Amino acid sequence: LYNVILSVPIVLLFCVLLYKCLLNFGLSPKSAKHAVLPEEDFDCRAAYPNEWKTFGFALGVRVLVMVAALFCIMIGSNEQVSLWDCLAKLRLWDANHYINLIDKGYSAYQENGEHLFLVFYPCYVWLVRIVKLIIPNTELAGALVSALCFSWGCCWVHKLAFESYDKSVADDAVLFLSVFPFSFFFGTVMTEGLFLLTTAAALYYAHKHKWLAFGIWGAFAALTRMIGILVVLPG
């Protein structure tokens, strides 16, 4: 109940920011129906295969990196360890905080006697809690959410780069984003994957001048990380 009470003013705040953002971009009720759907004809059958290839490639890289990480943990251990023990080893950096917030909630989890309201935003925590209804293990559920969000985010990056440049640049953007050494964080129990998804989608719709969709994705970005608010506020 405490988490719900805390979440209500946060959601209301971002709704107000979204409304102000839409007004600043000149969105009226009459134009709202044109804000999400593109005015030009769109061939879904031609677009979806490329998106699925991009999604599959990005997800495949994340799976390979995770398998390699778990394998290294297994061979580096002096005793026999299970898969769940290996997943528990992923409690590194901020992942430990997110895992505790997912399991205990914002009201129950404290560090040095203080709550972590201002640093760790709730969107990722909410998503993983939903997935935990199907996959009880927090580390596995969190890693799955991160990998899927990253893969979907790569689709938006590919679309934005394709429309801004060409297919070669779009393919390279996804490739380098996926294999960059620090891309390991996109598959951990942290917000990097979800933040990529929300910001890339918001920027794509800003590029297309679809301000309602831009505002919605921007609000999710703001609920994911503190700097996500910069996506929502109009320039």
What are these regions (language model features)?
Residues G187-L194:
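Short acidic/glycine- and proline-prone juxtamembrane loop motifs at membrane-interface regions
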